[in-house]
Curated annotation (Swiss-Prot):
It comes from the Archaea. It comes from Methanospirillum hungatei JF-1 (strain ATCC 27890 / DSM 864 / NBRC 100397 / JF-1). The keyword Iron-sulfur applies. Its cofactor is [2Fe-2S] cluster; Mg(2+). This is Dihydroxy-acid dehydratase. It is an enzyme of class 4 (lyase). The gene is ilvD. The lineage of its organism: Archaea, Methanobacteriati, Methanobacteriota, Stenosarchaea group, Methanomicrobia.
Length: 547
């Protein structure tokens, strides 16, 4: 066992003495040492219940014949961090979490690890650590929040963000907004729709790194507590059989994750995170794989925010196993941490609510819900949630309205300075330029709330999974790296064509070269973690991992 490095032989008597001080019994000393990386805290709604799940995981590990040791990592709520300086710290926290879990695994020589996590950057951060350390691992995702309800209508956090735009537009009062914000979020769990946290939970299950049914089970259901116990028992089996993350996270399982992502129409952030997970697991992966698979996989579930269905509805419709069944012919048969392969899980499904998870013969859209765009504005790629774009905006040309940062753009939007047909460009919000690649949910939600229907938004920053509409993010190279987006001027014509997967700046290459003369990138004063992050982070098209 790996843990023998800290507990076997007379030379390790001091180490054992410290372990015995924890109350560890002699019999426990000879069992596999299993780490539990929890991310419980009392500020993130998706994480407030994780202490209970951690207790149940410990019980499962003990029942399975292992010795559990629990520790904590940080966790940031993107929704609370949204719209202010705090958003710049969210993506860097992913690397902090991956590093923290690695540090604990390697310092204490755990034989296996259970990762308990729910929200946007915590799930990929822990998956990155699992792939990097490559000891037996299972991820337990914490589950989704139940939908809110007001006057008989189901609600999610996006309704509140869009309510801000409605107040600015005069179609909602501040009192009505207060009533909405109070009703929208009824308890613990990840935000209710197929936003980034829930999409990453689905990706985790599709990769094979969590037990079947885990992704869509709501946070407050007893099933989630049972899944925690089973996860604890199962990790001990994985240790004994030495089934490792790199046996599970393979080119084929990553392709399966993308297929499920396309079928559901998940968050654009999955592109960034799956690339990072692949890098940490040592799997070569190309950004264009997303487009290739998108053309093969129909979009079969109309999930919030683009559609009506919550994650609770997805759970009752059969969850990710039901998605496997509906697109089984497209999936590759990979092993999972459960001991069952993907086909076995798909074939074990007894019921699918096809009003939620449609058969591929009658999809929401014929192709997948995400798309990689390239062109003169994004030579190294950009991402759009095509499944959330209205038909009339699949091909659009309009004048650029350029803003060096989200705050300036938000002021212009709320002041109604944007016209229908405009293409808003928000730059210097990339991995280095932001730094931290903040999400642009506030401006996109304000546009919806104000009633705009023909305004596109392009950025080298990111979008929340709650974003809908013609919003193109992750533009690479970013402005801070001298990408073409740095040289766009107000009034330049930009063409977006989702049919050809292109986004082009309609000026000549010579004009771009002229604009480069004397160019100096916007520099924000940085200290601490953001300064270190900006100096070390790589480009978005490679997952924005530290170099």
């Amino acid at each position: 066992m790996r843990s023998d490095d800290v507990k076997a032989g007379y030379a390790r008597a001091p180490n054992r003495s410290l372990i015995r001080s924890l109350g560890i019994d002699e019999s426990e000393m000879h069992q596999p040492f299993i780490g539990i990386a929890n991310s419980w805290n009392t500020i993130v709604p998706g994480h407030t219940h994780l202490r209970v799940l951690g207790e149940r995981v410990r019980e499962g590990i003990t029942a399975g014949g292992g010795t559990p040791f629990e520790f904590n990592t940080i966790g940031i709520c993107d929704g609370i961090a949204m719209g202010h300086e705090g958003m710049r710290y969210s993506l860097p926290s992913r690397e902090n979490i991956a590093d923290s879990v690695e540090l604990m695994i390697q310092a204490h020589k755990f034989d296996g690890i259970v990762c308990i996590c729910t929200c946007d950057k915590i799930v990929p951060g822990m998956l990155m650590a699992a792939g990097r350390c490559n000891i037996p691992a299972i991820v337990l995702t914490g589950g989704n929040m139940l939908p809110g309800n007001l006057h008989g209508c189901e609600l999610s956090l996006t309704d509140v963000f869009e309510g801000v735009g409605k107040v600015a537009g005069g179609t909602m009062t501040e009192e009505e907004l207060t009533e909405l914000e109070t009703a929208a979020m009824p308890g613990c769990g990840s935000c209710q729709g197929l936003y980034t946290a829930n999409t990453m939970a689905c990706m985790t299950e599709a990769l094979g790194m969590s037990l079947p049914g885990c992704a869509a089970t709501p946070a407050v259901y007893a099933d989630k507590i049972r899944l925690a116990y089973r996860t604890g028992k199962r990790i001990v089996d994985l240790v004994r059989k030495q089934i490792l993350p790199r046996d599970i996270i393979t080119p084929a399982s990553l392709r399966n994750a993308i297929r499920v992502d396309m079928a559901l129409g998940g968050s654009t952030n999955t592109v960034l995170h799956l690339m990072a997970i692949a890098t940490e697991a040592g799997v070569p992966f190309d950004l264009q794989e997303f487009n290739r698979l998108s053309e093969q996989i129909p979009h079969i579930a109309s999930m919030m925010p683009a559609g009506p269905h919550s994650m609770q509805a997805l759970h009752h419709a059969g969850g990710i196993p039901a998605v496997f069944r509906q697109i089984r012919s497209h999936l590759e048969n990979c092993q999972t941490v459960s001991g069952m392969d993907i086909y076995t899980i798909a074939d074990s499904v007894k019921y699918v609510d096809e009003s939620v998870i449609r058969p591929e013969q009658s999809p929401v859209h014929q192709s997948g819900g995400l798309m990689i765009l390239t062109g003169s504005l994004a030579p190294d790629g950009a991402v759009i949630k095509s499944g959330a774009v209205q038909d009339e905006m699949w091909k659009h040309t309009g004048p650029a309205r350029v803003f060096d940062g989200e705050e300036l753009a938000m002021k212009a939007i709320l002041a109604r300075e944007i016209k229908e047909g405009d293409i808003i460009v928000i730059r210097y919000e990339g991995p280095k330029g932001g730094p931290g690649m903040p999400e642009m949910l506030s401006p996109t939600s304000a546009l919806v709330g104000l009633g705009y229907s023909r305004v596109a938004l392009i950025t080298d920053g990111r979008f929340s999974g709650g974003t809908r509409g013609p919003c193109i993010g992750h533009v690479a190279p970013e402005a801070a790296a001298g990408g073409p987006i740095a040289f766009v001027k107000d009034g330049d014509q930009i063409s977006i064509d989702l049919f050809t997967k292109t986004v082009n700046l309609n000026i000549s290459a010579d004009e771009i070269e002229n604009r480069k003369k004397g160019w100096k990138p916007l520099k924000r004063p940085l200290t601490g973690v953001l300064a270190r992050y900006a100096a070390a982070v790589g480009p978005a098209d490679l997952g924005a991992v530290l170099q």
